[in-house]
Amino acid sequence: MKQSQVRGRGTSHLLLGAVIVGIMLVVLLEVIVQLLPPHYNPTSQSESDLAVGPYGFLMALDLVIGGVLLLLFIVAFRRVIPKEGQSRSGLILLGVAAICKLTIAFAATDLTPRPETIHGTIHAVVALVSFFCEALGLLLLARSLRHVPNMRPSPRFLVGLAIVTLVWSVIVIVTVVVSTQIEVWGLLERVATALSFVWVLTVSLGLWRFPSLDGMPGRRTIPSSPGEHLEQEALPRFT
């Protein structure tokens, strides 16, 4: 039992570590691509535009990493958080968002105000679905974490951040549907993406410490012999 728990902790730490490193890599890659030709305007042009050009493969890789790290986060979340602190709907929505990110990595966008090709249309629609599903999924997960005692960071903070992320994502979606001439579209999109990554990064850092923190939920002391006590963890359970 003890050995399986140790292995479980190791696997969970590995997954969460991969998520944390993945987020840093996503940010680094986007900065690098932004600095390379053809130097798209980050304020007015979408992140996806960076995937069109001589170094577009780097942005495509960036999108793939973003989708994979979300999937890894889902697996780690399920392993570390007890069932009463999980939201099945939230995890499903986050999974849909991850698949959408992987899809848009292979469906290039069109560098036009409105999509003009099949792959451009697929990219635009799937990207909007990804924004909404990810933001709503994060909010549902944040609400479910209120059932986990001593959760760090505070579920109240996570709910607030998730609400801001969802509202901002809706604004991004509305701006696309209403008009394609908004000159700060690129900035709006990047802020929405950043808010989502900040939420995932914050929770990942908290969960990375979760299994080993003293005083976390489910940790209790039971006697093993007269005058002796043995510390045992009931939650979280690792399988």
Label the model's feature ranges.
Residues 212-238:
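Short, highly charged, low-complexity non-transmembrane loops/tails of multi-pass membrane proteins
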Residues 1:
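Short, conserved interaction/coordination micro-motifs, predominantly
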Residues 4-211, 217:
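Hydrophobic, aromatic-enriched alpha-helical segments typical of multi-pass transmembrane helices
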